[in-house]
Curated annotation (Swiss-Prot):
InterPro entries to which the protein is assigned, alphabetical: Tropomyosin (IPR000533)
Name of the protein: Tropomyosin
SUPFAM superfamilies for the chain: Tropomyosin
Top-level taxonomic group: Eukaryota
A Pfam family of this chain: Tropomyosin
Domain notes from UniProt: The molecule is in a coiled coil structure that is formed by 2 polypeptide chains. The sequence exhibits a prominent seven-residues periodicity.
Amino acid sequence: MDGIKKKMIAMKLEKENAMERAVQYEAQLKQKEEEQEKKETEIGELNNRMKQAQTELDEIQEALQDSLNKMEETDKRATNAEAEVARMTRRIRLLEEDLEVSSSRLTETLAKFDEASKTAEESERGRKELEIRSIADDEGLSQLEDQQKEGKYIAEDADRKYDEAARKLAIVEVDFERAESRLEAAESKIVELEEELRVVGNNMKALEISEQESAQREESYEETIRDLTERLKAAEQRAAEAERQVSKLQNEVDHLEDDLLSEKIRYKDLSGGLDQTFAELTGY
């Protein structure tokens, strides 16, 4: 009888210990589940941060590409403007050369005209002298007539030369007027080109400023990208560490659940043994 009582007391103590361990296991299990839930929440937040960082990185890369495209387009416009300026400069140089040629031709024609005028004046003076001599000396009339004819021929030849010089002068004047028109057009174009050059210069200054700002923005973008990349790597490392901790907690939870199940089985066995012992005592 004493042995049965001792056995009952021992079984009761073991039952109480088993219940206490079961309560501890349940508390630990609850704590581990809370920790696991917390870690899963942290993993979700990290995933959201990683997605946000990736989105920001994509936006920055897109903005950087847009800036590079704008810089390329601006450089292309500046190159085209420089080519246009060079082309117009060549045209101005050709016009200036044409004007020099026309001026030279005009000077040459005027010189020939002066020479023809002098020849005509000399012929006229010779004719008048012949007329005077013919009046003064009847005997030399025939000679004077010959001289008069010669003078007339010289005068006619001078007139022809004068007409030819006048015709050439008219042509030169037309060429000169055209050259003046081209010169005026060239001067107007020069003014226009100077204005365009001024605008291009201002645009180039603006482009240089924009390029400097773009370079600064690019450096800022690159720094932001590096920062985001580091943050992304850190977030990935934290996420991996959190997943490892969750896996570890899951293993601990599984182990605690196994221990709790074992304790419940032991408790059930002890309860069965106590019931059997009570039945035996009742039988006595």
